[in-house]
């Protein structure tokens, strides 16, 4: 290695002794490597030993010990090369006196970095000299031609490697290289093979003389000088792996398979593959191909990849804002500039690989890296990125992900379409505000609100100051636009639509509600015409669960408003958009954007009179509720965007709340009912009245109850509410009143069973409150938000009555259920139709105690209630603890379902029966009558179909696939051959005809059932095993049967009792 000490370095030792120690110390890399035990060498460079820099750190001591191990082997060629250099030195020094200091600094920097330790430890060298300077001025005559002088222009691989290193050193000063390869996916190679490639710690050994070297460069130099290699790299190499034998350790081909090795050990210029690193090095030496591999400025450093996520977070937050538009989009935005990006795009090899250069054998990672740059590429602007995180950050910061969502939409991801060019104003604000959000969004995938909240509150404070400072419309518009942008950034993590999205007009030509509606319609059609392939099939019909509710809840989608896209609508900032959270009517009150605040004040005045009366009534539940509410600190809202938007619209009032988590919650509660003229009060009352109440009434009253039965959007709404709402129940933090209402009405009795009125009122008050603090974007979106213009006719006049309703209803209505629904409706003048529908629904619900639970898991609890009330009044005995496979089914419900299923069978021309799905209406009727949720019915049907397809039979139907089906009656065990006979047989058990199911109201059916006492008596005459003297009653469910056989069958099938126990559960009744 002493051979590396070039003439200039020695000259410097003598001529510029004063410079050298400073340099050395500054470099922090003592020139330990230049010292060798040989005396002649010591004499040759005395100043290296005497200089202060010669004190060794433990690390360098270590590396020197490595050197001394092998120095004896190297002595032969070291001494000769030293003599050569000493000869040339005499010639060179006089020529070079003028330039010696320049090249000296360069060479020292290079050598220190390149040779001093295997870790390439962090150098804080301020070297910005271009590599060309180094090539011209620095002669390293370590190659076999010792006569090369500084100006000779002999450009060998060693110079090139140094040039490369010089480049890297200048820009990648901070790189901790040891973990370099953790980011390059060469995981297949065992670290034993080339330990130092991966760790930098062990040795490269020469195959011939076993000399060990710290770097691949040194090994290659050694091979070059001593001739310890065979130049077998011919064209045939690829096809002829059998050459002179290599130790097994050195042969990647043998270890890992030919393909892997060839992919990795490949000359980047000519594409030849090699068996070992040595062969590759030799090839590079001989062909000079290393000079032809493109080597431009290195791109963004590895640091971005290497720093752990914990450290990445702060750096992102600090640095992203400074250059949000940098095409590199990497966290270290300052280091990547546009030229890097251009080079990256123009040349596949200008990729992160350059930062490794030839160090540590990293050259064979180039191929992978080159490909990676093609993969991690922004589809919009084409910039390449080193890691997925960087690409994500780039997309977030520049908003490019929005522009490529078309394809995503086609693949079915629910992403908002947005206009391609955001307006200037929006962009300006994005730069300031949305960037940190993007960072937080992408760095903290955890949904813990805490991680995001501080950032948001800061944002909000910024916004407050801004808005207070400038109240005229322009800045406000900008703010709102940027708020939208922020909102989008946050929610982009989820890719969910929000109500806000629905309110915006379809600039991009995409009407969300329309497309949603089409999707749902096609889904429903699929569900009706056969089992579709998608997994949501069984639950889609939950949509049709509450007919009246459907009629009220959501307008015909035809009328749905066009939606404004997310970005770039700062020109159109109309109240509708301003109060996206707030929802329709609030915006209707203030048609002119600039009169937002005045409109609010007027509205507040109107509302205060009405609400003041109710204030006292509400205060009690409110105060009860506020502590729990406060428990969810407001920053949670950062997890979704509404509060931010809300905050934009409602000016300073709302912001104070955001910034002081607990008290504002209270304020919100007291303020909204009492509408205190505090600004808080103003803002909140408005949204309250607007969004939660008249919004819905506007929609409800707008279309008549005669509307077609199943509106796709209402279907979707209901499904979302049932499933999302249900799922999110644990994390109560946020549902809006609309979706809450849907959810409640869908599982009303279930709640009624467990909840006493106070909790329900509490819950109700909570939604009113939660309306402003949506904490989870995961809550069901309220599709009605999109219909803002439908209720335009409802002016502020409508709002004031409306706004009183929540308070009044919750205080006056005692039943939990009614309060829930009525609170959702409002006392608005136009509400009669809606309310009458709701009252009908409530009547049905309360009288039958039906529970509309949406999950199959609650079927048992549900049908115990259902069965009890629907079948006979006296059936509600403690039959709740049934066991067995069908314990959760009320037998009567099964009969209805089986009959309906049989009715849906269609006979083909060949005489076989095919299954067709029940129409939503039929399911609806069953659901209304039995109280089973649509989901449950759909699951049952899907299960039956699955069994029939798979095995050709199910419990009540066998041999369907043969064309000669046999139907089994659950009650009396009769076997029937045709669907029509089976249906009439089941109808005789039920006591009514299936086609009457839709016409009969629940009361009529209940009465009918009560009159017929036991439907099975009706079919006694037709029962083959009838015993005229007695009927048999099941003690568990009080049903009566015509024969012992039937009751035993019933006990085993329905209650899972074994035949031995039958006598315990059967009582004989005399016929009356």
Curated annotation (Swiss-Prot):
- Biased segments, Basic and acidic residues type: 57-71, 228-237, 469-481
Write down the superkingdom of origin.
Eukaryota
Instruction: Tell me where in this chain the PTM Phosphoserine is found.
Output: 672
* Compositional bias ranges of the Low complexity kind: 791-815, 847-860
Subunit and partners = Interacts (via N-terminus) with HDAC1 and HDAC2; the interaction is direct. Found in a trimeric complex with APBB1 and HDAC1; the interaction between HDAC1 and APBB1 is mediated by TSHZ3. Interacts (via homeobox domain) with APBB1 (via PID domain 1).
Which PROSITE patterns does this entry report, sorted A to Z? HOMEOBOX_2 (PS50071), ZINC_FINGER_C2H2_1 (PS00028), ZINC_FINGER_C2H2_2 (PS50157)
Instruction: Kindly list the ranges of residues that form C2H2-type zinc fingers according to the record.
Output: 204-228, 265-289, 376-400, 967-989, 1032-1055
Q: In which tissues is it expressed?
A: Expressed in cortical neurons.
Q: Which GO terms describe its cellular component?
A: growth cone; nucleus
Q: Gene3D superfamilies recorded for this chain?
A: Classic Zinc Finger (3.30.160.60)
Per the annotation, which location comes first and is thus the protein's main one? Answer: nucleus
Write out the annotated subcellular location.
Nucleus; Cell projection, Growth cone
Keyword Phosphoprotein annotated: yes
Q: Which family does it belong to?
A: Belongs to the teashirt C2H2-type zinc-finger protein family.
InterPro entries, sorted: HD, Teashirt_fam, Znf_C2H2_type
Compositional bias (Polar residues): 571-593, 649-660
The Gene Ontology biological process terms listed for this entry are: in utero embryonic development; kidney morphogenesis; kidney smooth muscle cell differentiation; long-term synaptic potentiation; lung development; metanephros development; musculoskeletal movement; negative regulation of DNA-templated transcription
What job does this protein perform? Transcriptional regulator involved in developmental processes. Functions in association with APBB1, SET and HDAC factors as a transcriptional repressor, that inhibits the expression of CASP4. TSHZ3-mediated transcription repression involves the recruitment of histone deacetylases HDAC1 and HDAC2. Associates with chromatin in a region surrounding the CASP4 transcriptional start site(s). Regulates the development of neurons involved in both respiratory rhythm and airflow control.
Protein name as annotated: Teashirt homolog 3
